Structure formats: structure tokens, C-alpha cells
Amino acid sequence: DAGTVYGDSIIGTLGIYDSRQYDGTFADGSSRAANHDLCDHVLSSICNDIRTLYEPKWTRRGMWDSRYFEAWSPRVPAMLLELLSHENFADMRYGLDPRFHFTVGRSVYKGILKFLSDQYGYDYVVQPLPVEHFAAVLNDKRQVELSWQPVDDPLEPTAKAEKYIVYKRVGNGSFDNGTVVKKTRCVMDVPADEVVSFKIAALNQGGESFPSEILSVGIASASTAKPVLVVNGFDRTGAPDDFRSNDDEQAGVLADDDNGVPYKQMISYVGKMKEFRRAIPWTDDDAAGYGDSYGNYEKLVIKGNTFDYPALHGQSILKAGYSFVSVSKAALADHAYMNADLYSAVDIILGKEKQSKMGRIGAVKGFDFKSFDQTMQQAITDYCKAGGRVFVSGSYVATDIFQNPLVKAEDADKKFAREILKYEWRDDKAACEGAIKTVASPLTEERADYSYYNKPNEESYVVESPDAIVPADPAAYTCFRYSENNLPAGV
């Protein structure tokens, strides 16, 4: 309850410690002045990292030597951390973003680590960041070849990967305990007619990184056809869409437009924001004022981006009689994976990928998670011109190119959509009831109904406002429509 202010002002981070209780000593007789040092390390780590990566105007509110129970009662080094004001719009634009969560959690860890290093005179090593540019393909011996790249931490020179753990999962089972390797490439045997999945973690003396996305392969033993390449293009996590009125009197998050993408799952979501007037004060918990939300999701753990979609698509590909491999979107910059001589088709998973901001526009970061970046556009163009076949699925395949409210549309992007993928934007927020149907077309004469997740749930990320798209070529045709209004859902 640190308060709310207008504009883009950040209330920021406060640390609280106690140095005077128990005659100023811990149980072992050492000075409680160490609490000050711990607090300073953690606050410095948080504020430096946030200012460098996201928001140069992030406020360090200071440190209080105060008799808060949680600060004075422990007889070991302790501090209280008030990271931000959950009432303040400018703070919470960052506070709702999973990337911010990761950075701050890592900052706290680094602050504690450096405090212990100072206390005991040891050198420290920070655990590595997750690897990127992951790819899982099959070689001529029908073995899987895994490759990836380490990621250096610009904020911490000790956080370099020394080794890696390769985790494997067969079918719908659990991941094994992992195999340690020293290089950024690994070859393994895989059983046929099973979806086999992998994830990578980096290792050093400081510990183990967060895992990579999950990529999968499958060998259809009876198939003589070329395999299908699956591109895992959905790597977005982020806060909900937000707005601020021109007069600054209203601001908040737009759950019906895009409620954000949690990292794997979210336990803290209670419901949509319903009070946007910034002047409305808190009265009591039944009239919570600005930022008040519904409570209909208090008991639900909301699913976000699991980073595990090639396995899901691969099950269907394998069932259809094709082998498949998968690569990350970033890996397309390293190798010409989209090769019509090697793959019978390419399945591009985009999910809720779209150009998104972090907090205040113009702070440090630009826009991340473009659905079709230049590398992908070129790879798809070359593949299609060589006779390749492409299947693309995603909520914002047109809006991100034609009508993203954050970014000016580029003529080259629109030309790519129209001339290579043969579709055009018709509408955003095209449907809300979660149902589509097939229509008579060269694809199929069969009538079928399908559903998608249109509300927060425990099974899948939610699709709040999918696109309507129309053919942009005389040879193209509509094959799906939204059941509620007949707007075109697929081309």
C-alpha cells in the first residue's frame, strides 16, 4: 500500500532491516549491522538490474532501520523487501510481467550471494542464464541431433555456462534425471513411433539455469516420406495490454484484449480489473478503489506459455504417418532449416506471439516477440518459392503485421503476408466464444466444429481476441469461420 501517483512516476523499492534488537548482536555474538549490509546488497542489485534492463527511472526509496517484527525477530541476517507499489500503475506495468519477475528474483539471489561472499570471504559464481537457439533434428542414422547456444549475462560476468544437462522425455512420461555434456551439441538414439522431447539447462559452479524451451522429435517407422519441420515460434511471456487515458484520469490493463502470457502458470490471478478511475481511493476490501478486480479466478491456477508445443503438434503429425523434428524460432538465424529438399512441410506455431512492450514505451527495451521477424520471413519465402508447404497457427498472425497498435505497420511485412502466405487482415478481436467451424472449400467438404480456450483455465493459455483473416490471392480460400459471427478464421 505504498500509494499511487499519476503519470509514469515509479514509487519503487524499499528495504527494511533492524540493527538494534538483542543488544545489536545475533545469537553467535556477531553484529546485527550485517542486516544493513544484506539490505544494501539486495536493493543495489535490484535497482541496478531494473535500471539497466528496463526502466532507468526506477526509484530506490531507501533503507529503514526500523522495528518491524519480521525484521527484528530473526537472530540471523534478515531484511524486508517492498519491491514496488501494487497500487501504482507505472510500477505494476512491470510488476505484471514474467520477465520482470525473473529479473527481480535473480537480482535478490545475486544480492544475497554477494552478501555471503563478503561475509565469509569467498568468491562467488552466479548460475547461468537459460540457453537459446535450440534445435532438435534427425540425422541419416535416425538419431536426434541436439544443438543450442549459451547466453552470456551482461550484468554478471561470472554467469558463464561450463556444462549442460540434457533432459529427455518419452511420450507423456516425465523427464529423466538428465545427462551432463560439455559441448553445445549432443547426439542420441530415440525410439521409433514415440514423441521424444528434450530440454537443456546450463551448468556452472553457481548452479543450474532455468530450462530451455522443450523441443521434440518423432520417427514414424513405416513412413518413407520426408519429415515435417515444426518451428516453435511462440516464445512470448508478458504483461497484459494496458492503457492510460489522455487526461491521465483512467489507466489499467485490458484483459479482454490480451491478458498477458504467464511463464508456464500463474497462481496470483484473481480476475479482470474493473475499477480504472485513478482518483477512487481504497475504502475497505469490498470497495478497494483504483485497481479493484473481480475475484472469480481466485481458486484457479492459470496456465500460460508451457514452451512445450512441438510435442503436442508432433503427436498429430506422427499419427498422420510422418516423422517430425523441431527447432526454436531463434535457431532459424543459424541454419537454413526450412529446406524443401529435406522436409515435406513446415508447421509454424505462433500461439499468442505478437510485438509487445515492457512497461513504459521508450524506456530501455523496444518491442519483442514479433510474429514474423525478418529472418523467419526470408526463410518462409525461400521455402515457399522452392515448392514447400507451410501451416501457420496463431492468434495475431494478421494484427501483428497490419494493425498492431504499438508499432507502425511496415509495407514489407504486409507484402509478405499477402504475397507469400496469401492472407489479409480483416479484423482483430474477431470472436470471444471460443468456437470455429469448417466451411465448404477445397480443403474439405466435411462439416466439423472445433473449440479453443477463450477463458483463463488450467489447461492452456487463453485466446482472448483472435484475428479474422481473408484470402489475398485468387487461388486462396477461406476454410474456417468463427461460429458466433461467421467471420473468417482460417485461409
Write out the residue ranges for each language-model feature.
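Beta-strand-rich modules
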Residues: V187-E208
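A short, glycine/acidic-enriched catalytic loop
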Residues: G3-S31, R360-K365
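Helical hinge/lid and interdomain linker segments adjacent to catalytic or ligand-binding clefts
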Residues: M266-A409
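Active-site-adjacent mobile loop/cap segments within catalytic or ligand-binding domains
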Residues: G3-Y6, Y54-G121
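Short beta-strand segments within Ig-like beta-sandwich modules, predominantly Fibronectin type-III
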Residues: D176-K183
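Pro/Thr/Ser/Gly-rich low-complexity, intrinsically disordered linker/stalk tracts
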Residues: F115-T158, G206-A225
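A glycine-rich, often tryptophan-bearing local segment used as a flexible ligand/cofactor-contacting loop or short
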Residues: E353-S465, P471-Y477, S483-E484
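Short beta-strand elements bearing conserved aromatic residues within extracellular beta-rich modules
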Residues: E162-V166
